Each structure stands twice: as C-alpha cells, then as structure tokens.
UniProtKB/Swiss-Prot annotation:
It comes from Pyrobaculum islandicum (strain DSM 4184 / JCM 9189 / GEO3). Keywords: Cell membrane, Hydrolase, Membrane, Metal-binding, Metalloprotease, Protease, Transmembrane, Transmembrane helix, Zinc. Binds 1 zinc ion per subunit. Belongs to the peptidase M48B family. Signal peptide: none annotated. This is Protease HtpX homolog. GO terms for biological process: proteolysis. The gene is htpX. It comes from the Archaea.
Amino acid sequence: MFPIFDPIAFGLYLLGYIVMIIVAVVIAPKVASSISGRFTLYGAMALTAVLIVLTTAFVIYLIAIVAAPALAEYGWGFILGMIFFVVLMNLITYIASPFLINVTYGARPDPRLQEIVDAVASRLGAPFRIKAVVVDGPPNAFAYGNFLTGRYVAVTSSMLALTDKRELEAVIGHEIGHHLHRDNALMLLFGVLPSILYYLGVSSVRIALSSSNNRNNNTMLLAAVGILAVVVSFLVQLLVLAFSRLREYYADTAGAKAAGKEAMQFALAKIHKFYFSNPEAHEIISGDKFRALFIYALVNAVANPFITVTRSEIEEIKRSSYSVIQEIFSTHPPIPKRLRFLDQLQI
C-alpha cells in the first residue's frame, strides 16, 4: 500500500520549487533583459530547444555514467521503468485529450466556420484537412488533435460573436499555424523531459537512501545527482515555458499571413480588452486544464459582440505594463509584447 505522504518526494519537490522561484524572480528577468533583441524568433527557438535537450541529456548522463556502479547494484530496471511510465502516461494523455476536449467543451461541427477554416488553410498552404468545431465558453480558440482523431481548430461561439471576418481569419490562421508547426507533438516531446528528470531524480535519491550501505561513495553520489536532477527539472520547466511562448509568436506569424498584421492585432486587442473589463471571470480560464492550448491563456471574459477596439487603444495596450514574473510562468506571452512583435514582423 502506498503511503499518503512521501517525505522524500515532498522535500525534493519543495527544494526544486524554491530554486525555481528564486531563478524566476532574481535571475530570469535579468537574463531576458540582457538578451532581448539579440536573436531572431527562429534563433531564439533553436537556442531554447538546444538548451532544453542538452541540459536534460547532461543530467541523464550524470546519472547513467557517473553513478553507474550504484545504479547497477540498486535499480537500473526500476529507474528505466520509471522513465517508460512517464513517457507512456504522456502518450496516453496525448491520444485521449482530443476525445476529452470534444466531450468537455461540447464540440460540434459548423458549416460556416468550416468554410472559413478551409479558406484560411488553403491560403497558408496546409497540406492536410482541418476540422472546424464550435465549442462553448468565453471567447477563445485553440488547435488540438493527433494521428488518430485528425486535426481540429475549435472556436468558441463567443469568439465568433466578438470578431469580424478578417479578425476571425487571423485567429484561425494562428491556430492552423500550430498545426503547420506541429506544436502539439513538439510540446508533448519537450514537456515530458522535466517530468523524466524529476522522477528520475526522486527515484535515484530513494534508491540511495534505502540502500543497506547508504554511506558508501556510490550511493552518496547517486543521492547527490538525484537531488541535482530534481532541481534541474524545475529549471528545464522554465525553459519549456519559454519555448512555448516563442511558439505562440511563431503561430502569430501564421495569423498575420492569413489575414494581415492589423487583423491579428485587433483580434488580440479585443481579447485583451475583455480581460480587463471582466476580471470576475478570471477563474474560468485560469483554472482550465486545457488553457495551454488557447490563443490567450489568461482571457477571462464573457463575450460582448458590441465591444470594439480602436487603433489608439491598440497603441495604448502596446505601452501597457505587465508582470515579468507572471510571463515567466506562462505558456503565452503578454498581449502587449505580441502586439509589438507583430509591428516588427515582415510578411
């Protein structure tokens, strides 16, 4: 029978979380400020991806090679089984999530929306068919699907009421961009790496501490590397979030190509305006388990088709402040930065 409270796992999680908070509050903003504007979008994505992969590979190398004697004696099979379990659970989630989304959000086909999605997909050169569905909820849109279910673009009925045709095409273009860029599969791949490091680290520490001779060099080294793996797993998670934000910029380029930069900006600005005019609805989206898929993960408004946005309001939003700390822990960049990015975009 498994214990309700695991002090080893809790202590390691707390340590990793504290280190992550310190890095996010003290170090990450300074690093972001120092490298801002030094890389193109493609360069930033490539650099972040390389950092994620190399950091993960290095820590696994430490456990596999540096602590090999201890692992050979105390549990190679268990640790490899743990990695397999983490990967398997993520694959099951990836396969099941489209079915869950269809049920959870009441996804239903819409012929008019399908025509728009088909037109935008053709404009962007999509080589595959994308199913269009309308779902319930606050104004939002998201892309999902896999090799079993096919590809979907979901738009809430309130988003249809909020946007005009060009703005809707920009939003749909953003979501089709996620499909073209294979972001669902890519984020699944990168998202599993912190989990592998975390469970690998916890398992290593547990094996070291449960050894009958846990004071020898091998087991002490295994425990030290295990603690390092847990801490690094939280830092890699910050890199994965940064990579996700970069992919959102990348999807915005598809939205701009589909309907123009101005339409993309007006659509984002309308969502932003809803956010500030309806703070009471924040919990609806911020607590949603699928919020990472949304075009705007923090949108929290109920649709009002009579809300409009002017160019002067967009310029004001571009200059508005935002929490750097909140951005670091978010899957999506803040709207002011996305609007400024679109200004600089050459299409």
